[in-house]
Amino acid sequence: MQLFPLCLIISCSCPTVQASKLCLGWLWGMDIDPYKEFGASVELLSFLPSDFFPSIRDLLDTASALYREALESPEHCSPHHTALRQAILCWGELMNLATWVGSNLEDPASRELVVSYVNVNMGLKIRQLLWFHISCLTFGRETVLEYLVSFGVWIRTPPAYRPPNAPILSTLPETTVVRRRGRSPRRRTPSPRRRRSQSPRRRRSQSRESQC
């Protein structure tokens, strides 16, 4: 099993510093949180159960359907697009590693153990990353952060004192208790009544008085 960390370091040589740090952080226990720069944290994501996140195949299909042109573009679109590129590349290299291990390890038990570790543990991290950045691009980062906070409060509240259903991301802006900071929409106030101009009859009487 000592071969696995070495292979992971080699396979995770993604073309960006952030992706390399991310892979090394998983191995050597560095305090590197890939969500910090986006206002979230690994701990905040951990409130969501593992079965909450779609499969990697579904997430990759979603990313391809919605953002393929931007992901393949040589231009910098947003930090979320960059993070998505890194996560997709890293998962591809992990799959190459799992294939290599499956072909070269003679011990079936060790081979199954390594492949299972990649699919379960590393797979969950990639699923979390993909879900977070796809959701931020789809719903907006502030909405996703509000959802994570709302879900964390809901899951930690005893069942007797919380709503029966967990918050839903797509309906969060309409129902969340955590309000986004910003100016409240202006209310339209009725404009003051304009003073009526003097009627022609009144103006005529005044003109007659001035002539007298």
Curated annotation (Swiss-Prot):
GO terms for molecular function: DNA binding; RNA binding; structural molecule activity. GO terms for biological process: microtubule-dependent intracellular transport of viral material towards nucleus; symbiont entry into host cell; viral penetration into host nucleus. The keyword Glycoprotein does not apply. Sequence repeats lie at residues 184-190, 191-198, 199-206. Pfam families: Hep_core_N, Hepatitis_core. Keywords: Disulfide bond, Host nucleus, Host-virus interaction, Repeat, Secreted, Signal, Viral immunoevasion. Residues 178-205 have a biased composition (Basic residues). InterPro entries: Hepatitis_B_virus_capsid_N, Hepatitis_core, Viral_capsid_core_dom_sf_HBV. Residues 165-212 are annotated as: Disordered. Residues 25-27 are annotated as: HBEAG. The record marks R183, S184 as: Cleavage. May regulate immune response to the intracellular capsid in acting as a T-cell tolerogen, by having an immunoregulatory effect which prevents destruction of infected cells by cytotoxic T-cells. This immune regulation may predispose to chronicity during perinatal infections and prevent severe liver injury during adult infections. Homodimerizes. This is External core antigen. The gene is C.
